[in-house]
């Protein structure tokens, strides 16, 4: 047979010298007559191909080519001793040397039967990733020709999506046409062998959605200004749903440009590229447009900016006035009582470091990098406000000023006085300078200027108007003298003064009236009326002065829907809280309000150990406080003593009520209020959460320095740093203080980085504190991050600053009626119905959660408290999820913001939910910032429970039995 084949091929070659034929395929030495052959398990596979010229095989898998060999003549052989199901497929033979005969091919489909595998699938093809709209062939190759009903279904047993269109090919697999994102799922190929369904391995199909929009491209500034020789750095922020996009720059600059890209993946469906263009030293020729361009398969998007290069620093000032005043330039004339807005547009580089108006009115300024708009609002102007208004601006390298000259139109005022028996003088004030005209008429008349009297009138233009006095800013005084002629009749003389603004007149009766002292009496009555009005106004302003009101309320009893609140002034005061004044050393002021302040102090002998020293906070009144404020401070003292001790409220330690002003001694919280703490830690927190690589390179920009300066807000209560590592709220020997004082301040927990667990702990601790207040029948009414303090071990404690906050100057407190209220933190029933309950505290707690997980942002950002705000709250508007809130935390927020108070969770429920997020451990076990010093750990003292100072009220057994809490479903306080 082997010798016969070359002879046969030679005959075929000579016979086909005129016309070539399709190649011939032999399967196991037999000419293939059909399109399919079957290889039984355990047998070999041999395929030969021959033709009129050199031939070659095309196999399904490239690796099968290693089984090929060339035989004598124009023969090509594939020989596999023990083929597996992998060799199932279509084998195609073609002419390899003659391009004009490539179309002459022969093929055969080989089934390699495998009783254990009806389908052969490649492991590399099981995970399918394709773009939307593409076709894809699932390589489900049947190894058994007897298999029937080849099909496709989902791996979970359900049918394919109804919109999926596919075609079955027994020799190739299943072709899915026009892939869609809705096809994303796991699929299997199915077939029946002797009535039994067989399935292939699972194919996981992931269709990448076709991009429909170009990349997002953003440049921070519309214009950049630089001085010759300065460095320019422009950041272009871009993002795209996938990796298939690029960022380029278009610029006309002449200087050398370097471009750096920072790539970051934000989840599966977003790639961020920050492209940074840098010119180390700009030149005047670099002035021009610069564009950042992002390109993907959907198109192109760009953002443009302009570079202006100047030779030297500059400050340019232009006036900005409303259109009707713009033509007046810098000299502005307005009517009395009108509003005036003076505006200045400032262009400066480098940016201004200081700006001010030379006027007592507060300015408002909005600014970009080098363009500013400063405006001065003058409401209902009066004569005293006219004058020169100068705006000053300066930078490190330049300064400038611009002045407006504001003059006010004033209606003239005419006054006639009798100089002698024949002479009258009329004096008038106004701006512009008034003109004076005299009239006289017979009889006693209210006016001579008009025909309504029916009497003859005489005009005397010969009485000239003379300017007496002119001020630079103010009314012009003019005067006119009129000589009265002799007459036997009573006569009325009228002086009329007029200018562009208005007219004023005054009359004089030449013959003396019989009613003596009438003018005097009228004048006295007028003065008395003005005095009474002034007195009423001063009394009203006195009543409007801010009064301190303690926010916390204690419920005494409940009868049906009627609730009785305890008058805090009627609460008893336990004398055991008294502490000697001479053992209290006052320090710096930590916070101040309108009538009170909080100072840091050192207490000697406070507690059971009479030799210890303790840092405390002392609340006291200012010298200008009224009796109402003194009574309110005593009420606060009584409420704190009534509540008792809890780890998550600022506890009362003592008081001084005799021999001087009232002093309330409380725990000292060295890390200040939670709001400022979150804002101070925000930058490092974001860097840690986002895992930005640059944080290690630029760590000096973010880490806390031991001697860093902390700023004290007027409304923040207690916020300070300390040069001592004093144990927080624990008695300590002076020697221990000195030893620990030598420790690095960086060991303080205030310098530790902030993480998500810290935010969860703060949330849990505040909820536990509020749960304690609720159990003591106490409504807080001002739950907010500014009213939560942190100890140096990061334990959150609830407080109420009250006297120590200046709510008149705190933007968080909005005027509503006759009070200033924290509207953005208040529940709807508190805003609209003046109803305060534990449930309204729950609403406020939801706002506090939002503050915590937004790292100290103001709630309802960029939303003014106006009618639109009230409508949105009433309709159930809820803030979106904060940047760093877990979904479970945001769910708690939304539960707290339920419009129906009874549907809101209790603080106990909230504590349980947050505790589960922390791992279900007891809060005391969760606290990693334990209240111990490093020295104690070394000495083996860390395992001892620190002694707690028990307040006198706890030792006095005032509360022999815990009463059933009165707070049930709805406890209302009606205003």
From Swiss-Prot:
Q: Where is this region: Regulatory juxtamembrane domain?
A: 544-576
Query: What's any GO biological process attached to this entry?
Result: regulation of MAPK cascade
- Identify residues that carry Phosphotyrosine: 563, 702, 726, 813, 929, 972
Q: Which residues lie on this side of the membrane: Extracellular?
A: 18-519
Q: Which residues are glycosylated?
A: 156, 165, 246, 250, 289, 301, 399, 420, 451
> Does Transcription appear among the keywords?
no
Asked if Protein biosynthesis is a keyword of the record, the answer is no
Q: Membrane-spanning residues where?
A: 520-540
Residues in the Cytoplasmic compartment per record:
541-975
Q: Where is the Protein kinase domain?
A: 584-918
Task: Please give the activity regulation comment for this entry.
Answer: Present in an inactive conformation in the absence of bound ligand. CSF1 binding leads to dimerization and activation by autophosphorylation on tyrosine residues.
Q: What Gene3D superfamilies does UniProt report for this protein, alphabetically?
A: Immunoglobulins, Phosphorylase Kinase, domain 1, Transferase(Phosphotransferase) domain 1
Which E.C. number(s) belong to this protein? 2.7.10.1
Q: Report the SS bond pairs.
A: 49-93, 140-189, 236-292, 426-495
Q: What class of enzyme is it?
A: transferase
As for membrane topology, the entry says: Single-pass type I membrane protein
Please give the residue ranges the record annotates as the region Disordered.
939-963
Q: Name one GO molecular function term.
A: macrophage colony-stimulating factor receptor activity
Q: Where is the Ig-like C2-type domain?
A: 34-113, 125-208, 221-310, 329-407, 404-513
Give the residues annotated as active site.
Answer: 782 (proton acceptor)
Record's comment describing the protein's domains: The juxtamembrane domain functions as autoinhibitory region. Phosphorylation of tyrosine residues in this region leads to a conformation change and activation of the kinase. The activation loop plays an important role in the regulation of kinase activity. Phosphorylation of tyrosine residues in this region leads to a conformation change and activation of the kinase.
What the protein does?
Tyrosine-protein kinase that acts as a cell-surface receptor for CSF1 and plays an essential role in the regulation of survival, proliferation and differentiation of hematopoietic precursor cells, especially mononuclear phagocytes, such as macrophages and monocytes. Plays an important role in innate immunity and in inflammatory processes. Plays an important role in the regulation of osteoclast proliferation and differentiation, the regulation of bone resorption, and is required for normal bone development.
Oligomeric state and interaction partners are given as: Monomer. Homodimer. Interacts with CSF1.
Q: Per its record, how is this protein called by name?
A: Macrophage colony-stimulating factor 1 receptor 1
Q: Which organism is it from?
A: Takifugu rubripes (Japanese pufferfish)
Q: What is the lineage of its organism?
A: Eukaryota, Metazoa, Chordata, Craniata, Vertebrata
């Amino acid at each position: 047979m082997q010798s016969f084949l070359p002879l046969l091929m030679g005959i075929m070659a000579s016979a086909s010298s005129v016309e070539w034929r399709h190649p011939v395929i032999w399967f196991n030495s037999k000419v293939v007559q059909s399109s399919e052959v079957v290889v039984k398990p355990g047998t070999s596979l041999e395929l030969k191909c021959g033709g009129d010229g050199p031939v070659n095989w095309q196999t399904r898998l490239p690796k099968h080519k290693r089984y090929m060999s060339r035989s004598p003549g124009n023969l090509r052989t594939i020989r596999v001793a023990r083929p597996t199901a992998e060799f199932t497929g279509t084998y195609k033979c073609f002419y390899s040397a003659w391009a004009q005969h490539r179309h002459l091919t022969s093929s055969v489909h080989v089934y390699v039967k495998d009783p254990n595998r009806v389908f052969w699938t490649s492991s590399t093809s099981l995970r399918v990733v394709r773009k939307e709209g593409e076709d894809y062939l699932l390589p489900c190759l049947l190894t058994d020709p007897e298999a029937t009903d080849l099909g496709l279904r989902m791996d979970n047993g359900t049918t394919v999506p109804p919109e999926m269109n596919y075609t079955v090919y027994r020799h190739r697999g299943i072709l899915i046409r026009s892939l869609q994102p809705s096809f994303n799922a796991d699929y299997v190929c199915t077939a029946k062998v002797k009535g039994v369904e067989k399935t292939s391995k699972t194919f996981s199909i992931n269709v990448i959605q076709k991009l429909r929009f170009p990349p997002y491209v953003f440049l921070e500034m519309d214009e950049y200004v630089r001085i010759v020789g300065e460095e320019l750095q422009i950041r272009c922020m871009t993002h795209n749903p996938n990796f298939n996009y690029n960022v380029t720059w278009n610029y006309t600059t002449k200087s050398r440009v370097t471009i750096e890209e920072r790539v970051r993946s934000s989840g599966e469906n977003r790639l961020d590229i920050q492209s940074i263009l840098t010119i180390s030293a700009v030149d005047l020729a670099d002035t021009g447009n610069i564009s950042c361009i992002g390109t993907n398969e959907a198109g192109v998007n760009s953002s443009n900016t302009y570079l202006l290069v100047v030779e030297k620093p500059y400050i340019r000032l232009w006036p900005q006035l409303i259109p009707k005043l713009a033509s007046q330039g810098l000299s502005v004339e307005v009517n009395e009582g009108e509003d005036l807005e003076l505006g200045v547009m400032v262009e400066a580089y480098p940016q201004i470091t200081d700006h001010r108006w030379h006027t007592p009115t507060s300015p408002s300024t909005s600014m970009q990098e080098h363009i500013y708009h400063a405006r001065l609002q003058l409401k209902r102007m009066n004569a005293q406000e006219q004058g020169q208004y100068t705006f000053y601006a300066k930078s490190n390298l330049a300064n400038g000023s611009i002045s407006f000259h504001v003059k006010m139109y004033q209606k003239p005022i005419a006054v006639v006085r009798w100089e002698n028996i024949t002479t009258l003088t009329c004096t008038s004030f106004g701006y512009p300078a008034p003109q004076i005209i005299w009239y006289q008429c017979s009889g006693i008349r209210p006016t001579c200027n008009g025909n309504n009297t029916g009497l003859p009138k005489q005009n005397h233009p010969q009485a000239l108007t003379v300017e007496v006095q002119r001020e630079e800013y103010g009314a012009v005084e003019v005067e006119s003298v009129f000589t009265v002629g002799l007459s036997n009749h009573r006569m009325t003389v009228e002086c009329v003064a007029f200018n562009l603004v208005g007219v004023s007149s005054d009359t004089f009766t030449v013959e003396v009236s019989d009613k003596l002292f009438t003018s005097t009496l009228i004048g006295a009555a007028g003065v008395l009326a003005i005095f009474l009005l002034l007195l009423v106004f001063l009394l009203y302003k006195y009543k409007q002065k801010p009064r301190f009101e303690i926010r916390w309320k204690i419920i005494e009893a409940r009868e049906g829907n009627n609730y009785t609140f305890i008058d805090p002034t009627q609460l008893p005061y336990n004398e055991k809280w008294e502490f000697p004044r001479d053992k209290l050393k006052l320090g710096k002021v930590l916070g101040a309000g309108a009538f009170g302040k909080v100072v840091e102090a050192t207490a000697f002998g406070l507690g059971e150990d009479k030799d210890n020293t303790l840092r405390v906070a002392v609340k006291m009144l200012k010298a200008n406080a009224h009796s109402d404020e003194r009574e309110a401070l005593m009420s606060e003292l009584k409420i704190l003593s009534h509540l008792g001790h809890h780890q998550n409220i600022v506890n009362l330690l003592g008081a001084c009520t005799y021999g001087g002003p009232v002093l309330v001694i409380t725990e000292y919280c060295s890390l200040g209020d939670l709001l400022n703490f979150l804002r101070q830690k925000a930058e490092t927190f974001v860097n840690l959460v986002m895992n930005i690589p640059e944080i290690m390179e630029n760590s000096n920009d973010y880490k806390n320095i031991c001697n860093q300066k902390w700023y004290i807000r007027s409304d923040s209560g207690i916020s300070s740093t300390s040069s001592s590592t004093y144990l927080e709220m624990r008695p300590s020997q002076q020697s221990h203080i000195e030893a620990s004082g030598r420790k690095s301040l960086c060991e303080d927990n205030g310098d530790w980085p902030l993480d998500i667990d810290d935010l969860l702990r703060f949330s849990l601790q505040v909820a536990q504190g509020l749960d304690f207040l609720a159990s003591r029948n106490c409504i807080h009414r001002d739950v907010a991050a500014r009213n939560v303090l942190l100890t140096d071990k990061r334990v959150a404690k609830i407080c109420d600053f009250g006297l120590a906050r200046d709510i008149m100057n705190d933007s968080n407190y909005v005027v509503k009626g006759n009070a200033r209220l924290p509207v953005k933190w208040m529940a709807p029933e508190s805003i609209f119905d003046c109803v305060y309950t534990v449930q309204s505290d729950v609403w406020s707690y939801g706002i506090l959660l939002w503050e915590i997980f937004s790292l100290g942002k103001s709630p309802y950002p960029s939303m003014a408290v106006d009618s639109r705000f009230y409508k949105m709250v009433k309709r159930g508007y809820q803030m979106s999820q904060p940047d760093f809130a877990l979904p479970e935390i945001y769910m708690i927020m939304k539960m707290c913001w339920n419009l129906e108070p009874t549907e809101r969770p209790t603080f106990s429920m909230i504590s349980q939910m947050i505790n589960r997020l922390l791992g279900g451990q007891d809060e005391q076990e969760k606290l990693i910032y334990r209240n111990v010093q490093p020295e104690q750990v070394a000495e083996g003292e860390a395992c001892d429970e620190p002694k707690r100072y028990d307040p006198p009220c706890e030792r006095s057994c005032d509360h022999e039995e815990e009463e059933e809490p009165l707070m049930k479903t709805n406890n209302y306080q009606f205003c």
